[in-house]
């Protein structure tokens, strides 16, 4: 193992350890975590089992099958709240090491280290299941690059059973693969994905209903559709007179995603670069941009970055961490011009700038930047390059 590899593993373990401390139930104050709220409080502590029971409000467990399975295993090994939290944190750290391993395989450079030290890993690393999903998705892409298509399809399906986002890779594989390779990949994905769905179909239906009933969450274009802002983001709780504005905002967002995604799909690029760009396309348009979702980018992002992207990465990450940091301190965090929504808008600006920079780096577009602005970016990039280049 080279020096940079050692630093990468130490970085991600350090960030996840800090996240463990921030979200720990014994910390005061303690940041909210979904594993302690959506799972432990609503299910494990009350003797309920995801999919077999519902939380007190009548809602189902909101995460797919593998997320529930990992939670059940951790609570079985851990016993009480403290034991569960320690077991879960150690599990996330193990997947964090896998995430770092895959990220280094995609691009072993100083920018990878910057990604592995992202504030999102500190603020949201132990929040939910995002590190696990990102690590499994990265492993599936790494196996795909190594032409191990059956294993890749299996692991991609497992990642989709933690969170759905990884299915964004399927169209790329359908276009890229031919003949038996395509058949092996799709069969492996379909069998692995559909097996638990066939075993517990009602749970899958509940999951689809739950996530399709969501409104607008931290989407930058709430400034364009202020009438779509509502403190409760579930559509069933929204007054009928607001539905037209919410639907218009959703159509606007998904139209942005589809146009950008089709553009990315048309580029001739490698699987890890495709994942980085397609995730950017999705989160620039999605009506629901949960701040913990930034973790999904981290294994792939360095593959489409150079040092000139460093200012935009810092802006994007700082704004993303600010969303949750300001959310509970705001009297009406869902409204435009409140601190969380301003942070979401700045986050979009940083992400859009990284997307344009990545497209320019890959030769997909040409951009002209004013000389003074370009000089400032280059100076900042050189400073960052000198700092991380020593690592």
Show which residues each predicted segment covers.
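Multi-pass membrane glycosyltransferase architecture that uses lipid-linked
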Residues: 1-208, 246-391
């Amino acid at each position: 193992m080279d020096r940079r590899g050692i630093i990468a593993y130490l970085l991600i373990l350090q960030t996840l350890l800090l996240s463990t401390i921030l979200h720990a139930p014994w910390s005061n104050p303690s940041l909210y975590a979904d594993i302690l709220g959506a799972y432990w409080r609503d299910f494990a502590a009350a003797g309920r089992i995801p999919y077999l029971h519902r939380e007190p409000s009548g809602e189902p467990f909101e995460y797919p099958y593998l997320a529930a399975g990992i939670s059940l295993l951790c609570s079985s090994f851990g016993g009480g709240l403290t034991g569960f939290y320690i077991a879960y944190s150690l599990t996330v750290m193990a997947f964090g090491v896998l995430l770092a391993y895959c990220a280094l395989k995609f691009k072993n450079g100083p920018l990878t280290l910057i990604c592995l030290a992202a504030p999102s890993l500190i603020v949201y690393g132990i929040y939910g299941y995002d590190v696990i999903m990102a690590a499994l998705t990265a492993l599936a892409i790494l196996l795909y690059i190594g032409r191990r298509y059956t294993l890749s399809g299996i692991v991609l399906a497992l990642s989709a059973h933690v969170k759905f986002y990884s299915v964004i890779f399927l169209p790329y594989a359908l276009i890229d693969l031919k003949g038996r390779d395509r058949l092996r990949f799709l069969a492996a994905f379909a069998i692995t994905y559909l097996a638990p769905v066939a075993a517990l179909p009602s749970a899958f239906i509940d999951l689809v209903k739950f996530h399709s009933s969501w409104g607008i969450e931290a989407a930058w274009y709430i400034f364009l559709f202020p009438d779509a802002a509502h403190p409760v983001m579930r559509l069933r709780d929204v007054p009928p007179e607001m539905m037209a504005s919410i639907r218009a905002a959703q159509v606007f967002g998904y139209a942005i995603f589809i146009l950008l995604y089709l553009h990315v799909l048309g580029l001739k690029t490698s699987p890890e670069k495709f994942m980085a760009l397609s995730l950017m396309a999705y989160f620039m348009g999605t009506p629901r941009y949960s701040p913990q979702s930034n973790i999904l980018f981290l294994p792939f992002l360095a593959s489409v970055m150079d040092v000139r992207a460093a200012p935009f990465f810092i802006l994007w990450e700082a704004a993303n961490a600010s969303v949750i940091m300001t959310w509970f301190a705001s009297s009406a965090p869902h409204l435009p011009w409140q601190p969380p929504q301003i942070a979401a808008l700045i986050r979009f600006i940083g992400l859009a700038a990284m997307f344009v920079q990545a497209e320019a780096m890959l030769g997909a577009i040409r951009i002209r930047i004013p000389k003074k602005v370009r000089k400032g970016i280059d100076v900042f990039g050189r400073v960052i390059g000198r700092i991380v280049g020593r690592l």
